[in-house]
Amino acid sequence: MIWHVQNENFILDSTRIFMKAFHLLLFDGSFIFPECILIFGLILLLIIDSTSDQKDIPWLYFISSTSLVMSITTLLFRWREEPMISFSGNFQTNNFNEIFQFLILLCSTLCIPLSVEYIECTEMALTEFLLFVLTATLGGMFLCGANDLITIFVAPECFSLCSYLLSGYTKKDVRSNEATTKYLLMGGTSSSILVHGFSWLYGSSGGEIELQEIVNGLINTQMYNSPGISIALIFITVGIGFKLSPAPSHQWTPDVYEGSPTPVVAFLSVTSKVAASASATRIFDIPFYFSSNEWHLLLEILAILSMILGNLIAITQTSMKRMLAYSSIGQIGYVIIGIIVGDSNDGYASMITYMLFYISMNLGTFACIVLFGLRTGTDNIRDYAGLYTKDPFLALSLALCLLSLGGLPPLAGFFGKLYLFWCGWQAGLYLLVLIGLLTSVLSIYYYLKIIKLLMTGRNQEITPHVRNYRRSPLRSKNSIELSMIVCVIASTIPGISMNPIIAIAQDTLF
Protein backbone atom coordinates (compact mmCIF):
# COMPACT_ATOMS: atom_id res chain seq x y z
CA MET A 1 0.00 0.00 0.00
CA ILE A 2 2.85 2.40 0.93
CA TRP A 3 4.64 1.50 -2.31
CA HIS A 4 1.47 2.23 -4.27
CA VAL A 5 1.09 5.71 -2.68
CA GLN A 6 4.77 6.52 -3.27
CA ASN A 7 4.46 5.42 -6.89
CA GLU A 8 1.43 7.68 -7.39
CA ASN A 9 3.28 10.62 -5.82
CA PHE A 10 6.24 9.99 -8.10
CA ILE A 11 4.00 9.97 -11.17
CA LEU A 12 2.27 13.19 -10.07
CA ASP A 13 5.60 14.94 -9.40
CA SER A 14 7.00 13.79 -12.75
CA THR A 15 3.86 15.02 -14.52
CA ARG A 16 4.12 18.45 -12.85
CA ILE A 17 7.79 18.76 -13.82
CA PHE A 18 7.02 17.73 -17.40
CA MET A 19 4.11 20.18 -17.68
CA LYS A 20 6.20 23.01 -16.25
CA ALA A 21 9.02 22.26 -18.70
CA PHE A 22 6.53 22.09 -21.58
CA HIS A 23 4.98 25.41 -20.48
CA LEU A 24 8.40 27.09 -20.37
CA LEU A 25 9.36 25.73 -23.78
CA LEU A 26 6.02 26.70 -25.32
CA PHE A 27 5.95 30.29 -24.05
CA ASP A 28 9.68 31.06 -23.75
CA GLY A 29 11.03 28.95 -26.63
CA SER A 30 10.88 31.89 -29.04
CA PHE A 31 13.52 33.68 -26.96
CA ILE A 32 16.05 30.94 -27.71
CA PHE A 33 15.02 30.37 -31.33
CA PRO A 34 18.62 30.79 -32.68
CA GLU A 35 19.78 28.16 -30.18
CA CYS A 36 16.89 25.88 -31.17
CA ILE A 37 18.04 26.04 -34.80
CA LEU A 38 21.47 24.79 -33.74
CA ILE A 39 19.89 22.02 -31.67
CA PHE A 40 17.84 20.97 -34.71
CA GLY A 41 21.03 20.96 -36.81
CA LEU A 42 22.71 18.74 -34.20
CA ILE A 43 19.78 16.30 -34.30
CA LEU A 44 19.95 16.15 -38.11
CA LEU A 45 23.69 15.40 -37.98
CA LEU A 46 23.07 12.58 -35.50
CA ILE A 47 20.27 11.12 -37.64
CA ILE A 48 22.41 11.17 -40.79
CA ASP A 49 25.36 9.65 -38.94
CA SER A 50 23.30 6.84 -37.44
CA THR A 51 21.22 5.96 -40.53
CA SER A 52 23.72 6.34 -43.36
CA ASP A 53 26.56 3.86 -43.89
CA GLN A 54 28.23 6.00 -46.52
CA LYS A 55 28.87 9.41 -44.96
CA ASP A 56 27.72 12.16 -47.31
CA ILE A 57 30.40 14.75 -46.47
CA PRO A 58 28.95 17.69 -48.46
CA TRP A 59 25.58 17.24 -46.75
CA LEU A 60 27.17 17.24 -43.30
CA TYR A 61 28.97 20.50 -44.02
CA PHE A 62 25.85 21.96 -45.61
CA ILE A 63 23.67 21.18 -42.57
CA SER A 64 26.25 22.59 -40.14
CA SER A 65 26.86 25.78 -42.11
CA THR A 66 23.16 26.31 -42.87
CA SER A 67 22.14 25.99 -39.22
CA LEU A 68 24.78 28.57 -38.25
CA VAL A 69 23.74 30.98 -41.01
CA MET A 70 20.05 30.60 -40.11
CA SER A 71 20.87 31.34 -36.45
CA ILE A 72 22.72 34.49 -37.52
CA THR A 73 19.76 35.55 -39.68
CA THR A 74 17.36 35.02 -36.78
CA LEU A 75 19.53 37.17 -34.52
CA LEU A 76 19.63 39.96 -37.10
CA PHE A 77 15.84 39.97 -37.38
CA ARG A 78 15.57 40.24 -33.59
CA TRP A 79 17.92 43.24 -33.39
CA ARG A 80 16.60 46.27 -31.46
CA GLU A 81 13.77 44.31 -29.83
CA GLU A 82 12.88 45.08 -26.23
CA PRO A 83 15.04 43.29 -23.61
CA MET A 84 13.28 40.23 -22.24
CA ILE A 85 13.96 37.81 -19.38
CA SER A 86 12.71 34.26 -19.93
CA PHE A 87 12.85 30.74 -18.44
CA SER A 88 12.06 31.97 -14.92
CA GLY A 89 14.90 34.48 -14.96
CA ASN A 90 17.59 32.11 -16.25
CA PHE A 91 18.02 33.70 -19.67
CA GLN A 92 18.05 37.30 -20.87
CA THR A 93 17.65 38.59 -24.41
CA ASN A 94 18.97 42.05 -25.25
CA ASN A 95 21.21 43.80 -27.77
CA PHE A 96 24.34 43.33 -25.67
CA ASN A 97 23.91 39.56 -25.42
CA GLU A 98 22.85 39.19 -29.03
CA ILE A 99 25.87 40.96 -30.48
CA PHE A 100 28.16 38.56 -28.60
CA GLN A 101 26.06 35.63 -29.79
CA PHE A 102 26.44 36.98 -33.32
CA LEU A 103 30.23 37.08 -32.90
CA ILE A 104 30.31 33.47 -31.69
CA LEU A 105 28.16 32.30 -34.60
CA LEU A 106 30.38 34.26 -37.00
CA CYS A 107 33.47 32.53 -35.58
CA SER A 108 31.93 29.08 -36.02
CA THR A 109 30.68 29.87 -39.53
CA LEU A 110 34.19 30.88 -40.61
CA CYS A 111 35.88 27.99 -38.78
CA ILE A 112 33.93 25.19 -40.46
CA PRO A 113 35.34 25.94 -43.96
CA LEU A 114 38.81 26.00 -42.38
CA SER A 115 38.40 22.41 -41.27
CA VAL A 116 37.14 20.80 -44.51
CA GLU A 117 40.42 19.95 -46.24
CA TYR A 118 42.27 19.47 -42.95
CA ILE A 119 39.86 16.75 -41.80
CA GLU A 120 40.01 15.03 -45.18
CA CYS A 121 43.83 15.03 -45.20
CA THR A 122 44.22 13.87 -41.60
CA GLU A 123 41.37 11.32 -41.94
CA MET A 124 39.68 12.42 -38.73
CA ALA A 125 36.05 11.56 -37.95
CA LEU A 126 33.94 14.29 -39.51
CA THR A 127 30.52 13.98 -37.87
CA GLU A 128 31.85 14.06 -34.32
CA PHE A 129 34.01 17.07 -35.15
CA LEU A 130 31.02 19.04 -36.42
CA LEU A 131 28.90 17.92 -33.45
CA PHE A 132 31.51 19.18 -31.00
CA VAL A 133 31.87 22.51 -32.82
CA LEU A 134 28.10 23.12 -32.91
CA THR A 135 27.65 22.04 -29.28
CA ALA A 136 30.47 24.33 -28.16
CA THR A 137 28.84 27.15 -30.13
CA LEU A 138 25.54 26.39 -28.41
CA GLY A 139 27.21 26.53 -24.99
CA GLY A 140 28.84 29.85 -25.84
CA MET A 141 25.51 31.32 -26.96
CA PHE A 142 23.76 30.25 -23.76
CA LEU A 143 26.62 31.73 -21.75
CA CYS A 144 26.16 35.11 -23.47
CA GLY A 145 22.49 35.18 -22.47
CA ALA A 146 22.86 33.60 -19.03
CA ASN A 147 21.18 35.61 -16.29
CA ASP A 148 21.77 33.47 -13.20
CA LEU A 149 24.72 31.79 -11.49
CA ILE A 150 23.66 28.24 -12.37
CA THR A 151 23.37 28.94 -16.10
CA ILE A 152 26.63 30.91 -16.03
CA PHE A 153 28.31 27.81 -14.59
CA VAL A 154 26.62 25.13 -16.74
CA ALA A 155 26.87 26.91 -20.12
CA PRO A 156 30.69 27.28 -20.14
CA GLU A 157 30.99 23.66 -18.99
CA CYS A 158 29.11 22.65 -22.14
CA PHE A 159 31.61 24.72 -24.14
CA SER A 160 34.62 23.45 -22.17
CA LEU A 161 33.78 19.74 -22.46
CA CYS A 162 33.60 20.05 -26.24
CA SER A 163 36.83 22.07 -26.22
CA TYR A 164 38.64 19.29 -24.32
CA LEU A 165 37.44 16.71 -26.83
CA LEU A 166 38.38 18.87 -29.81
CA SER A 167 41.86 19.65 -28.48
CA GLY A 168 42.59 15.91 -28.20
CA TYR A 169 40.93 15.00 -31.48
CA THR A 170 44.15 13.66 -33.05
CA LYS A 171 44.53 10.80 -30.57
CA LYS A 172 47.73 9.45 -32.13
CA ASP A 173 49.56 12.74 -31.62
CA VAL A 174 51.47 12.77 -28.31
CA ARG A 175 51.42 16.59 -28.19
CA SER A 176 47.65 16.60 -28.60
CA ASN A 177 47.20 14.16 -25.71
CA GLU A 178 49.49 16.24 -23.51
CA ALA A 179 47.62 19.43 -24.40
CA THR A 180 44.26 17.83 -23.63
CA THR A 181 45.42 16.55 -20.25
CA LYS A 182 46.70 19.98 -19.19
CA TYR A 183 43.59 21.67 -20.57
CA LEU A 184 41.26 19.27 -18.75
CA LEU A 185 43.04 19.47 -15.40
CA MET A 186 43.30 23.26 -15.42
CA GLY A 187 39.75 23.60 -16.72
CA GLY A 188 38.37 21.43 -13.93
CA THR A 189 40.35 23.37 -11.33
CA SER A 190 39.16 26.73 -12.65
CA SER A 191 35.53 25.55 -12.70
CA SER A 192 35.82 24.51 -9.06
CA ILE A 193 37.28 27.89 -8.15
CA LEU A 194 34.53 29.67 -10.09
CA VAL A 195 31.69 27.78 -8.43
CA HIS A 196 33.29 28.38 -5.02
CA GLY A 197 33.19 32.12 -5.75
CA PHE A 198 29.54 31.77 -6.77
CA SER A 199 28.78 30.11 -3.44
CA TRP A 200 30.15 33.15 -1.56
CA LEU A 201 28.06 35.44 -3.75
CA TYR A 202 24.98 33.26 -3.22
CA GLY A 203 25.37 33.25 0.55
CA SER A 204 26.15 36.95 0.86
CA SER A 205 23.05 37.93 -1.13
CA GLY A 206 20.70 35.86 1.02
CA GLY A 207 20.25 32.96 -1.40
CA GLU A 208 19.73 34.81 -4.71
CA ILE A 209 21.02 33.43 -8.03
CA GLU A 210 19.74 35.93 -10.63
CA LEU A 211 22.27 38.68 -11.35
CA GLN A 212 20.03 41.66 -10.65
CA GLU A 213 18.41 39.96 -7.67
CA ILE A 214 21.87 39.39 -6.21
CA VAL A 215 22.38 43.18 -6.17
CA ASN A 216 19.03 43.65 -4.39
CA GLY A 217 19.90 40.86 -1.97
CA LEU A 218 23.26 42.44 -1.12
CA ILE A 219 21.49 45.72 -0.37
CA ASN A 220 18.92 43.98 1.85
CA THR A 221 21.55 42.01 3.77
CA GLN A 222 23.94 44.98 3.93
CA MET A 223 26.73 42.67 2.67
CA TYR A 224 27.77 44.60 -0.44
CA ASN A 225 31.01 45.79 1.20
CA SER A 226 31.67 42.68 3.28
CA PRO A 227 34.83 40.50 3.18
CA GLY A 228 32.70 37.73 1.68
CA ILE A 229 32.14 39.79 -1.47
CA SER A 230 35.89 40.42 -1.77
CA ILE A 231 36.54 36.68 -1.47
CA ALA A 232 33.85 35.97 -4.09
CA LEU A 233 35.41 38.57 -6.41
CA ILE A 234 38.87 37.00 -6.15
CA PHE A 235 37.64 33.45 -6.78
CA ILE A 236 35.37 34.45 -9.67
CA THR A 237 38.14 36.52 -11.28
CA VAL A 238 40.49 33.53 -11.12
CA GLY A 239 37.81 31.22 -12.56
CA ILE A 240 36.91 33.52 -15.43
CA GLY A 241 40.61 34.24 -15.98
CA PHE A 242 41.12 30.66 -17.16
CA LYS A 243 38.54 31.16 -19.92
CA LEU A 244 40.00 34.52 -21.00
CA SER A 245 43.61 33.25 -20.52
CA PRO A 246 45.24 36.50 -19.41
CA ALA A 247 48.54 36.28 -17.54
CA PRO A 248 49.08 34.62 -15.09
CA SER A 249 46.20 32.23 -16.01
CA HIS A 250 47.76 31.55 -19.41
CA GLN A 251 49.84 28.42 -18.74
CA TRP A 252 47.51 26.11 -20.67
CA THR A 253 47.30 28.32 -23.75
CA PRO A 254 50.67 27.73 -25.52
CA ASP A 255 50.56 23.93 -25.06
CA VAL A 256 46.95 23.66 -26.23
CA TYR A 257 47.64 25.89 -29.24
CA GLU A 258 50.70 23.86 -30.24
CA GLY A 259 49.28 20.38 -29.63
CA SER A 260 45.71 20.73 -30.91
CA PRO A 261 44.68 20.46 -34.57
CA THR A 262 45.08 23.87 -36.21
CA PRO A 263 41.37 24.37 -37.13
CA VAL A 264 40.50 23.58 -33.50
CA VAL A 265 43.00 26.17 -32.29
CA ALA A 266 41.46 28.72 -34.67
CA PHE A 267 38.01 27.97 -33.23
CA LEU A 268 39.07 28.06 -29.58
CA SER A 269 41.22 31.17 -29.97
CA VAL A 270 38.24 33.37 -30.75
CA THR A 271 35.03 31.75 -29.47
CA SER A 272 36.29 31.17 -25.93
CA LYS A 273 37.41 34.79 -25.61
CA VAL A 274 34.16 36.20 -26.99
CA ALA A 275 31.97 34.09 -24.69
CA ALA A 276 34.14 34.69 -21.62
CA SER A 277 34.26 38.45 -22.29
CA ALA A 278 30.46 38.64 -22.47
CA SER A 279 30.13 36.69 -19.22
CA ALA A 280 32.87 38.67 -17.42
CA THR A 281 31.32 41.98 -18.43
CA ARG A 282 27.91 41.10 -17.01
CA ILE A 283 29.26 39.49 -13.82
CA PHE A 284 31.58 42.35 -12.94
CA ASP A 285 29.16 45.10 -13.91
CA ILE A 286 26.02 43.79 -12.19
CA PRO A 287 26.65 41.69 -9.01
CA PHE A 288 29.90 43.52 -8.22
CA TYR A 289 28.47 46.97 -8.90
CA PHE A 290 29.40 48.11 -5.37
CA SER A 291 32.95 46.72 -5.69
CA SER A 292 33.89 48.48 -8.92
CA ASN A 293 37.15 49.89 -7.53
CA GLU A 294 38.29 46.44 -6.42
CA TRP A 295 37.57 44.60 -9.68
CA HIS A 296 38.94 47.50 -11.72
CA LEU A 297 42.23 47.11 -9.84
CA LEU A 298 42.28 43.34 -10.35
CA LEU A 299 41.60 43.64 -14.08
CA GLU A 300 44.18 46.40 -14.48
CA ILE A 301 46.83 44.09 -13.01
CA LEU A 302 45.75 41.26 -15.34
CA ALA A 303 45.77 43.59 -18.36
CA ILE A 304 49.27 44.90 -17.61
CA LEU A 305 50.69 41.41 -17.04
CA SER A 306 49.00 40.08 -20.20
CA MET A 307 50.17 42.88 -22.49
CA ILE A 308 53.77 42.77 -21.24
CA LEU A 309 54.34 39.02 -20.78
CA GLY A 310 52.33 37.94 -23.82
CA ASN A 311 54.21 40.16 -26.26
CA LEU A 312 57.65 39.69 -24.67
CA ILE A 313 57.50 35.88 -24.69
CA ALA A 314 56.04 35.84 -28.23
CA ILE A 315 59.32 37.27 -29.54
CA THR A 316 61.27 34.16 -28.51
CA GLN A 317 58.93 31.56 -30.06
CA THR A 318 59.95 29.37 -33.01
CA SER A 319 56.53 27.77 -33.60
CA MET A 320 53.92 29.85 -35.39
CA LYS A 321 51.09 28.47 -33.25
CA ARG A 322 52.92 29.09 -29.97
CA MET A 323 53.73 32.61 -31.13
CA LEU A 324 50.04 33.24 -31.81
CA ALA A 325 49.20 31.77 -28.39
CA TYR A 326 51.34 34.35 -26.60
CA SER A 327 50.12 37.02 -28.99
CA SER A 328 46.52 36.19 -28.00
CA ILE A 329 47.47 36.64 -24.35
CA GLY A 330 48.63 40.16 -25.21
CA GLN A 331 45.48 40.77 -27.24
CA ILE A 332 43.20 39.87 -24.33
CA GLY A 333 45.01 42.54 -22.32
CA TYR A 334 43.75 45.12 -24.81
CA VAL A 335 40.21 43.72 -24.56
CA ILE A 336 40.29 44.00 -20.76
CA ILE A 337 40.82 47.76 -21.15
CA GLY A 338 37.36 47.96 -22.74
CA ILE A 339 35.82 45.94 -19.89
CA ILE A 340 37.35 48.28 -17.30
CA VAL A 341 36.19 51.43 -19.11
CA GLY A 342 32.60 50.17 -19.22
CA ASP A 343 29.67 51.95 -20.83
CA SER A 344 30.45 55.40 -19.47
CA ASN A 345 33.10 56.09 -22.13
CA ASP A 346 32.10 53.65 -24.89
CA GLY A 347 34.33 50.97 -23.38
CA TYR A 348 32.03 48.11 -24.33
CA ALA A 349 31.54 49.51 -27.83
CA SER A 350 35.32 49.71 -28.35
CA MET A 351 35.75 46.18 -26.97
CA ILE A 352 33.09 44.76 -29.30
CA THR A 353 34.54 46.62 -32.30
CA TYR A 354 38.03 45.37 -31.59
CA MET A 355 36.77 41.81 -31.07
CA LEU A 356 35.05 41.87 -34.45
CA PHE A 357 38.31 42.88 -36.10
CA TYR A 358 40.29 40.41 -33.98
CA ILE A 359 38.10 37.54 -35.21
CA SER A 360 38.88 38.32 -38.84
CA MET A 361 42.59 38.96 -38.21
CA ASN A 362 43.11 35.85 -36.12
CA LEU A 363 41.07 33.47 -38.26
CA GLY A 364 42.74 34.84 -41.40
CA THR A 365 46.15 34.10 -39.89
CA PHE A 366 45.11 30.59 -38.90
CA ALA A 367 43.67 29.95 -42.37
CA CYS A 368 47.10 30.74 -43.81
CA ILE A 369 48.77 28.45 -41.25
CA VAL A 370 46.35 25.61 -42.07
CA LEU A 371 47.08 25.94 -45.79
CA PHE A 372 50.84 26.11 -45.29
CA GLY A 373 50.77 23.20 -42.84
CA LEU A 374 48.79 20.96 -45.20
CA ARG A 375 51.19 21.69 -48.06
CA THR A 376 54.45 21.45 -46.10
CA GLY A 377 53.71 19.58 -42.86
CA THR A 378 55.35 22.17 -40.59
CA ASP A 379 54.45 25.22 -38.52
CA ASN A 380 58.01 26.31 -37.69
CA ILE A 381 58.50 30.02 -38.30
CA ARG A 382 61.86 29.48 -40.04
CA ASP A 383 60.20 27.20 -42.58
CA TYR A 384 58.12 30.11 -43.91
CA ALA A 385 61.25 31.70 -45.39
CA GLY A 386 60.85 32.50 -49.08
CA LEU A 387 57.15 31.62 -49.27
CA TYR A 388 56.52 34.71 -51.41
CA THR A 389 58.62 33.22 -54.23
CA LYS A 390 56.39 30.12 -54.34
CA ASP A 391 52.94 31.41 -53.38
CA PRO A 392 52.65 35.22 -53.40
CA PHE A 393 48.92 35.12 -52.67
CA LEU A 394 49.30 33.12 -49.45
CA ALA A 395 52.34 35.14 -48.35
CA LEU A 396 50.57 38.49 -48.90
CA SER A 397 47.43 37.26 -47.12
CA LEU A 398 49.45 36.15 -44.10
CA ALA A 399 51.41 39.42 -44.10
CA LEU A 400 48.22 41.53 -44.16
CA CYS A 401 46.65 39.58 -41.27
CA LEU A 402 49.83 39.82 -39.18
CA LEU A 403 50.19 43.55 -39.84
CA SER A 404 46.55 44.05 -38.88
CA LEU A 405 47.13 42.11 -35.64
CA GLY A 406 50.07 44.40 -34.96
CA GLY A 407 47.90 47.47 -35.54
CA LEU A 408 49.56 49.09 -38.54
CA PRO A 409 47.52 51.73 -40.44
CA PRO A 410 45.37 51.71 -42.50
CA LEU A 411 44.37 48.15 -41.59
CA ALA A 412 41.38 47.27 -39.40
CA GLY A 413 43.52 46.35 -36.40
CA PHE A 414 44.95 49.88 -36.25
CA PHE A 415 41.53 51.55 -36.09
CA GLY A 416 40.26 48.97 -33.59
CA LYS A 417 43.18 49.61 -31.24
CA LEU A 418 42.95 53.36 -31.79
CA TYR A 419 39.30 53.40 -30.73
CA LEU A 420 40.00 51.12 -27.76
CA PHE A 421 42.97 53.16 -26.52
CA TRP A 422 41.13 56.45 -27.07
CA CYS A 423 38.24 55.25 -24.88
CA GLY A 424 40.75 54.12 -22.25
CA TRP A 425 42.49 57.50 -22.34
CA GLN A 426 39.16 59.33 -22.00
CA ALA A 427 38.39 57.20 -18.93
CA GLY A 428 41.69 58.14 -17.30
CA LEU A 429 43.46 54.78 -17.77
CA TYR A 430 46.67 56.50 -18.85
CA LEU A 431 49.07 53.80 -17.62
CA LEU A 432 47.15 51.00 -19.34
CA VAL A 433 46.96 52.91 -22.61
CA LEU A 434 50.69 53.74 -22.56
CA ILE A 435 51.59 50.11 -21.87
CA GLY A 436 49.18 49.07 -24.63
CA LEU A 437 50.88 51.41 -27.11
CA LEU A 438 54.37 50.21 -26.16
CA THR A 439 53.46 46.53 -26.34
CA SER A 440 51.71 47.09 -29.69
CA VAL A 441 54.99 48.44 -31.06
CA LEU A 442 56.71 45.39 -29.58
CA SER A 443 54.23 43.07 -31.32
CA ILE A 444 54.87 44.78 -34.64
CA TYR A 445 58.54 43.77 -34.28
CA TYR A 446 57.92 40.01 -34.17
CA TYR A 447 55.20 40.22 -36.83
CA LEU A 448 57.57 42.10 -39.15
CA LYS A 449 60.26 39.52 -38.45
CA ILE A 450 57.95 36.84 -39.87
CA ILE A 451 57.01 39.02 -42.85
CA LYS A 452 60.70 39.58 -43.59
CA LEU A 453 61.14 35.80 -43.73
CA LEU A 454 58.12 35.46 -46.04
CA MET A 455 59.54 37.96 -48.51
CA THR A 456 63.16 36.78 -48.53
CA GLY A 457 64.59 35.64 -51.85
CA ARG A 458 67.92 34.30 -50.62
CA ASN A 459 68.33 30.66 -51.58
CA GLN A 460 70.43 29.87 -48.50
CA GLU A 461 67.55 30.95 -46.22
CA ILE A 462 64.82 29.05 -48.07
CA THR A 463 64.13 25.72 -46.37
CA PRO A 464 63.34 22.44 -48.19
CA HIS A 465 59.70 22.79 -47.10
CA VAL A 466 59.27 25.88 -49.29
CA ARG A 467 61.44 24.52 -52.13
CA ASN A 468 59.09 21.51 -52.38
CA TYR A 469 55.99 23.65 -51.84
CA ARG A 470 52.98 22.77 -54.01
CA ARG A 471 51.35 25.96 -55.15
CA SER A 472 47.62 25.96 -55.84
CA PRO A 473 45.97 28.18 -58.47
CA LEU A 474 44.56 31.53 -57.35
CA ARG A 475 41.02 30.66 -58.41
CA SER A 476 40.88 27.48 -56.38
CA LYS A 477 37.65 26.10 -54.99
CA ASN A 478 39.45 25.32 -51.75
CA SER A 479 37.15 26.26 -48.88
CA ILE A 480 40.12 27.24 -46.71
CA GLU A 481 41.22 29.79 -49.31
CA LEU A 482 37.69 31.19 -49.57
CA SER A 483 37.52 31.60 -45.80
CA MET A 484 40.99 33.15 -45.84
CA ILE A 485 39.97 35.69 -48.50
CA VAL A 486 36.91 36.73 -46.46
CA CYS A 487 39.04 37.19 -43.34
CA VAL A 488 41.77 39.12 -45.17
CA ILE A 489 39.22 41.51 -46.67
CA ALA A 490 37.60 41.95 -43.24
CA SER A 491 41.04 42.66 -41.74
CA THR A 492 41.77 45.51 -44.15
CA ILE A 493 38.75 47.32 -45.58
CA PRO A 494 36.37 47.80 -42.56
CA GLY A 495 38.91 49.90 -40.67
CA ILE A 496 38.66 52.69 -43.23
CA SER A 497 34.87 53.04 -42.81
CA MET A 498 34.17 51.82 -39.28
CA ASN A 499 31.58 54.42 -38.21
CA PRO A 500 28.61 52.09 -38.90
CA ILE A 501 30.33 49.31 -36.90
CA ILE A 502 30.91 51.68 -33.97
CA ALA A 503 27.30 52.89 -34.14
CA ILE A 504 26.02 49.30 -33.90
CA ALA A 505 28.44 48.49 -31.07
CA GLN A 506 27.33 51.58 -29.13
CA ASP A 507 23.74 50.35 -29.24
CA THR A 508 24.48 47.43 -26.92
CA LEU A 509 23.65 48.82 -23.48
CA PHE A 510 22.22 46.29 -21.07
Swiss-Prot record:
The chain crosses the membrane at residues 28-48, 57-77, 99-119, 124-144, 149-169, 183-203, 227-247, 295-315, 323-343, 354-374, 395-415, 418-438, 484-504. It comes from the Eukaryota. GO terms for cellular component: chloroplast thylakoid membrane. One of its GO terms (biological process) is ATP synthesis coupled electron transport. Its EC number is 7.1.1.-. InterPro entries: NADH-Q_OxRdtase_suN/2, ND/Mrp_TM, Ndh2_N. It is found in: Plastid, Chloroplast thylakoid membrane. Its main location: plastid. It catalyses: a plastoquinone + NADH + (n+1) H(+)(in) = a plastoquinol + NAD(+) + n H(+)(out); a plastoquinone + NADPH + (n+1) H(+)(in) = a plastoquinol + NADP(+) + n H(+)(out). It is a multi-pass membrane protein. NCBIfam families: NDH_I_N (TIGR01770), PRK02504.1 (NF002701). NDH shuttles electrons from NAD(P)H:plastoquinone, via FMN and iron-sulfur (Fe-S) centers, to quinones in the photosynthetic chain and possibly in a chloroplast respiratory chain. The immediate electron acceptor for the enzyme in this species is believed to be plastoquinone. Couples the redox reaction to proton translocation, and thus conserves the redox energy in a proton gradient. Belongs to the complex I subunit 2 family. PANTHER family: NADH DEHYDROGENASE (PTHR22773). This is NAD(P)H-quinone oxidoreductase subunit 2, chloroplastic. It comes from Silene latifolia.
